[in-house]
Amino acid sequence: VHGHYPSVPMQPAARLTDLHVCPMVTGVVPHVGGPIVSPGAPTVLIGGLPAARLGDMAVCVGPPDSIVAGAPTVLIAGQPAARLGDSTAHCGVITLGCFTVLIG
């Protein structure tokens, strides 16, 4: 139907401090992953924490990681909203989100 997007599963919204995993390895040192840290959207709080978005950074043992996928139809401060399961630049995924706020 014109004007409708294909069905996208609803996923919990990601926020600063939510975690991601990172499968990369530098030499013999695994990157592991860590929390989403900046910049986020400080004017949009989800479960009391700033919303995470496409382009936001995440802590990693190796070089800094960043969010490279988000909800194409939900923009927060001009960027796609990040969700549980969205990808990072190191081929990892966001593993935590606010389960009371679902974004499709």
Protein language model regions, located:
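Intrinsically disordered, low-complexity proline/glycine-rich segments
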Residues: 1-104
